[in-house]
Amino acid sequence: MHAVVLGAGYAGVTLARKLEDALPPAADLTIVEESDTHLVQHEVHRAIRRPSITDAIEVPLESLFDRAAVVTARVESVDSETGEVTLDSGETLDYDYGALCLGAETAFYDLPGVQEHGHTLKSVADAETIRERALEVIDTGEPASVVVGGAGLSGVQVAGELATLADEEGARERIDITLLEQRDSVAPAFPEAFQDAVADELAERDIEIHTQTAVTEATASAVTTQHEATGDTDELAADLFVWTGGIAGAEAMAGDRPVVRRDLRLTESTFAVGDAARIVDADGEAVPASASAAIRAATPAAENIAALAEWELAGGDGFEPELTPFRFNAPGWIVSVGDGAVAQVGPEVVTGKPAKAMKASVGAGYLSSIREVRKATELVGEELEA
């Protein structure tokens, strides 16, 4: 009996750690990840302004697992029906039960020039590249323009970091920062009160917001947009262009994010968890792609894989075991906006120091849950100083 977890983001790490406890002793467990570290992705934007945070948000994979075998390789393809995985080395892995936790890639929608000229934020290296370019622009001493495409949480956080970086470098008055969003508001997938508070925090930092505005093209020095309602086009100068405008499935899934429902089961042998899938929960609600959702979905997925493995090892007689449904209850939402933050818990929205403290506690709580107490302490210090 072999269980395989593909990907070591929030979903993969959480699921594999739970399987270490839940799988029958006779089962083998493998986790496959291209990198040898686990990244606390929701903090990576901080490295644009605070490179010192890197140590706190990168965790060696080998330190996270007691039972699972860690394979450092890129997943090239997955046959979710047969349970065969092809790695970049040409080697194949077969599983009896597998979990697709490959996360998502940045989507470019075939927009001319966007992939070529738009910086993305998926890694510490990406954050370092954005920081280097921002400092180059600042160091010219000339007026300059920064454009961020996409005003979901990632775009909001990038715009906030760049505005605060420019302020810390004494250049904010000559650096224009524009945040573009195709839908009607910033943070469009979130509650209205949260959206309003985020917009206020952005406005306080003189970040110009263009909603109902789609990016149609990018060059080395400009971004072309079109207003969704009027059809009017505009060209914005862009000395730095960052693209956070959407997600697509991993290359191993041919860019697809398959739909899974309450039991998170894609096929008889394969489950899909986290950003790798479009999840519809037990209440019929679409689950947002987020760290919180990925971590929470990993628990029922692990329970279901373990139950099926135990049933099969016992002979597989009779009906399959009843699987645990996933029901997503959002505990709240938090986003940093430069040196500020916005948090919503229930109906209440808070900003300022309380929100910053909550932001720090979320990251630290996650690191502590994976036994990285020292890194959790480091992260709290970095967040509260940000």
What does each of the following model-derived ranges do?
Residues G9-G12, G152-G155, A294, A302:
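Catalytic nucleophile loop
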Residues I130-I177:
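Rossmann-like NAD(P)H-binding beta-loop-alpha module
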Residues R67-A144, G149, V242:
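FAD-binding core/adjacent interface of flavoenzyme oxidoreductases
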Residues A297-A386:
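C-terminal, flexible cofactor-proximal segment of oxidoreductases
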Residues V70-S77, L93, D167-R262:
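A Rossmann-like FAD-binding core segment of flavoenzymes
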Residues E116-E142, S221-A222, E235-A307:
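FAD-site-proximal beta/loop scaffold in flavoenzymes
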Residues M1-A69, Q157-F190:
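Beta1-alpha1 glycine-rich phosphate/pyrophosphate-binding loop at the start
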Residues V44-P51, Q115-T120, G284-A291, V349-K353:
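Short glycine-enriched, charge-decorated loop/helix-capping segments at active-site entrances
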